[in-house]
């Protein structure tokens, strides 16, 4: 064999060996892992666990933020508003934006998967289909009337002055009111927090639910207790998030 032929043979062997690396043990698995890592997660359970559970609780309950595993809340909030809150966050509060277009890390498809997954997993429409839920958003009511509503509907748990009572904590704490939006307060009055024993608007006064005007008035009273915190923006009263 001539030197040139020997070199050609060696080159052919090396080329075949290098080509064969793709079928070596572990090679296909490594490539699959790389491709999986580059594919955005779309499963609701995985998205919720990674993005939401830290604040809203494992299984949608008992977190620092309001429970999402709540059929009354999901019957109250319009789907497009729920999507907006997840995608763009709530300015002036601890709710961040998750959409990439707003500085977060999720695609539009992932945002849709979260919204659809929340409704599919936890809405339970059979429990709320006959319930006339109050309006999600409304103008703030009269604080003076709201003070009377608070005394009748809320003081038994939260104390006469709102600073905490035998069953529940303060609703006028400056740090709390600085962290939440007007709409959050309204949503909490309507939907309650079943995971910690707080009833919804039907359970505050024996024998009847709160009327829509009473809800707006007591929210107006709560908002009137808020004090500005230097350097911290407050969510706009006109922004129903």
Predicted regions and their residues:
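Axial heme c-ligation environment in periplasmic c-type cytochrome domains
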Residues: 63-70, 88-121, 132, 136, ...
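Extended amphipathic alpha-helical interaction segments
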Residues: 136-142, 153-156, 160, 166
